[in-house]
Swiss-Prot record:
Its EC number is 3.1.4.14. It comes from the Bacteria. This is Acyl carrier protein phosphodiesterase. It is an enzyme of class 3 (hydrolase). It comes from Yersinia enterocolitica serotype O:8 / biotype 1B (strain NCTC 13174 / 8081). Signal peptide: none annotated. Keywords: Fatty acid biosynthesis, Fatty acid metabolism, Hydrolase, Lipid biosynthesis, Lipid metabolism. Converts holo-ACP to apo-ACP by hydrolytic cleavage of the phosphopantetheine prosthetic group from ACP. Pfam families: ACP_PD. GO terms for biological process: fatty acid biosynthetic process.
């Protein structure tokens, strides 16, 4: 899962949005560095990542990537799941529009930015004003996201090429999303993540 899905599942679970978004920027045990609520959000994010990566359907999705891109497929899929979520938001959350959800999330996170790592503050300087969470619905933006990640981290250069496999296998990958994500939503609502 990427930013949007983590925020979405956190909302369903009544978990800290800040903690869930911040988690990738916190190494080791966050106890003592952040409030218990934020720590719980960080830990939920980590559980979601482990859960997602070990799902048989997600392992099946990795099989749609050619050998050159299979190593980065988990990262590519995290971004792609956000694409499907953003594109189908109204079906999954008919009572709250995506722009309203994003505004709510932003209001929960931005007041706490001064207490967060500089890299996280830098992310937030782009995430909200450039409307990334809404733009995830656009497939060309997904290509741009993967290219940007590849440019920033040379070891992940294969991310840029992995977009070709998304285009080649878009429909079966979307079917896999629908096969697992609604169940994760239910687990979040039931506080089972």
């Amino acid at each position: 899962m990427n930013f949007l899905a983590h925020l979405h599942l956190a909302t369903l679970a009544d978990s800290s949005l800040l903690g869930n978004l911040l988690a990738d920027f916190v190494r080791g045990n966050p106890q003592g560095e952040y409030s218990p609520e934020i720590v719980a959000g960080i830990m939920m994010h980590r559980r979601v990542d482990v859960m997602t990566d070990t799902l048989p359907l997600v392992k099946e999705a990795r099989g749609y990537f050619s050998a050159d891109y299979r190593r980065v497929a988990p990262i590519t899929l995290d971004v792609l799941w956000d694409h499907f979520l953003s594109r189908n938001w109204d079906k999954l959350m008919p009572d709250c529009s995506l722009p309203d959800f994003i505004e709510h999330a932003q209001c929960q996170i931005l007041p706490h930015l001064p207490l967060t790592p500089a890299r996280f503050q830098n992310l937030n300087a782009y995430l909200w004003p450039e409307r990334w969470l809404e733009r995830y619905a656009e497939l060309p933006f997904i290509a741009d996201v993967l290219q940007g990640m590849a440019n920033r981290r040379p070891k992940l250069a294969a991310l840029a090429g992995s977009f070709h496999d998304i285009e080649q296998h878009y429909q079966p990958l979307e079917q896999l999303f629908w096969a697992f994500y609604p169940a994760m939503m239910s687990q979040a609502q039931d506080k089972q993540i």
